[in-house]
């Protein structure tokens, strides 16, 4: 299911939220409508956590995570960290990262298996990403842009990238990520995919300006038409068990 939402008249909902297969983070403030869209779709399955990061609401750009972990910048206060620890499921690891490029959501695009990161990220940060999120890390650009998290939206089912990504680069990224990939836009022609879209394995939320065509592309590439959370999780666990 792909839905449209707006945060206080802003269509950049990826700036104010973060969505994974085991939790969703939503910025404090905003209209109740924004929360209700998330909670109606996710409330029975994963916790929807209201929070700030470093006293700001741009939590989607400052954090990155997947179903196994969450990374937050060094500006995160002790109270915020404690609130997240209390609110997220127990198996989810939470780690503060002391990284010069502190907008982690802009410099990391990840799913449960792979992370594409800014080429200049510190070695220690790369190791933390690999360890806490339990992913394979690749230093990469998307259509020549170093902000991989801003210009790419990624789930375990597929990926949507900057519209100017060449066919050759799309093939390269697709083989790295091991998921089908398409170049496109969100919010009526915006190329900043990560800021306008959050997605997991069974639902996606896009800015209110997103056209029907853009939404259809999302539903198709992320395989959201008939996706059910419980079915996906149990299928994936069965697959993982059969390979281990």
UniProtKB/Swiss-Prot annotation:
InterPro entries linked to this entry: eIF6 (IPR002769)
Localization per record: Cytoplasm; Nucleus, Nucleolus
GO annotation, cellular component aspect: cytosol; nucleolus; nucleus; preribosome
Residues recorded as bearing Phosphoserine in the entry: 174-175
SMART domains named in the record: eIF6 (SM00654)
GO MF annotation terms: ribosomal large subunit binding; translation initiation factor activity
Principal cellular location given in the protein's record: cytoplasm
Paired cysteines (S-S): none
Presence of the UniProt keyword Cytoplasm in the record: yes
Keywords from the UniProt entry: Cytoplasm, Initiation factor, Nucleus, Phosphoprotein, Protein biosynthesis, Ribosome biogenesis
PTM section of the record: Phosphorylation at Ser-174 and Ser-175 promotes nuclear export.
The protein's assembly and partners: Monomer. Associates with the 60S ribosomal subunit.
Family as reported in the entry's similarity comment: Belongs to the eIF-6 family.
Protein task: Binds to the 60S ribosomal subunit and prevents its association with the 40S ribosomal subunit to form the 80S initiation complex in the cytoplasm. Is also involved in ribosome biogenesis. Associates with pre-60S subunits in the nucleus and is involved in its nuclear export.
Name of the protein in question: Eukaryotic translation initiation factor 6
Native source species: Schizosaccharomyces pombe (strain 972 / ATCC 24843) (Fission yeast)
């Amino acid at each position: 299911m792909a839905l449209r939402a707006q945060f206080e008249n802003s269509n950049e909902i990826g700036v104010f939220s973060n969505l994974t297969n085991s939790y969703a983070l939503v910025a404090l403030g905003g209209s109740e409508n924004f929360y209700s869209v998330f909670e109606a779709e996710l409330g029975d399955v994963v916790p929807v956590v209201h929070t700030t990061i470093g006293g700001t609401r741009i939590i989607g750009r400052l954090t990155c995570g997947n179903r196994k972990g969450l990374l937050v910048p060094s500006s995160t206060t002790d109270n915020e960290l404690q609130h997240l620890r209390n609110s997220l499921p127990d198996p989810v690891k939470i780690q503060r990262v002391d990284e010069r490029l502190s907008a982690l959501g802009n410099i990391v695009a990840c799913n449960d298996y792979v992370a594409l990161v800014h080429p200049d990220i510190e070695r220690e940060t790369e190791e933390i990403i690999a360890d806490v999120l339990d992913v394979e890390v690749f230093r990469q650009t998307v259509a020549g842009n170093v902000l991989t998290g801003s210009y790419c939206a990624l789930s375990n089912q597929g990926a949507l990238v900057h519209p100017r990504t060449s066919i050759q680069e799309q093939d390269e990224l697709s083989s790295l990520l091991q998921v089908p990939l398409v170049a496109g836009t969100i919010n009526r022609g915006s190329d900043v995919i990560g800021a306008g879209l959050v997605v997991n394995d069974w639902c996606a939320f896009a800015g209110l300006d997103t056209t029907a065509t853009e939404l259809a592309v999302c539903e198709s590439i992320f395989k959201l038409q008939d996706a059910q959370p419980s079915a996906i999780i149990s299928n994936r666990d069965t697959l993982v068990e059969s390979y281990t």
